[in-house]
Amino acid sequence: MKALLRNLAVVLFSTLLLTALVSAEEIAVIETKFGKIEIQFFEDKAPVHVKNFKDLANKGFYDGTIFHRVIPGFMIQGGDPNTKGDDRSTHGMGGPGYSIKAEFNDTPHKRGILSMARSQDPDSAGSQFFVVVKDSGFLDGQYTAFGKVLTGMAVADQIVNSPRDRRDNPNKRIEMKVKVINR
């Protein structure tokens, strides 16, 4: 009887462990001087954008970049490698050296949505992303939403309210470090 109970316990423990491993979800953690923003991905709605963001984060691409555009009542934007340098005139113009095709979906651009920045060309997204701090329905169907903030909107609010210049670039650098972890 003891052997049966022990075997049953081992099977139950193994099943629970396997279930936990299989159901582990990858999230992004954006670390700033104000705290952390945790992001859940929409892999079912924008798989290419999610993979691109994760790949860039895992390579350290975002580390040392800044939030270079902050507009109160709208969004915070980052992910430009040009922001690692001191020439503020180039902020907002950089990318990874390639573009990805838009994956517009039915996700509304409500507070906390993570979306991909782009130029006039819908298929010009690369590395720059933004977090919406106020519902912005005018973006729906025009920008690829690929995640949402799980925790850390208070951090995003601090970032968006930072003093900024006429180009909406914060006066003081708000650097980020981005990592992808299992949750």
Which role does the model predict for each range below?
Residues 7, 12-183:
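Cyclophilin-like peptidyl-prolyl cis-trans isomerases
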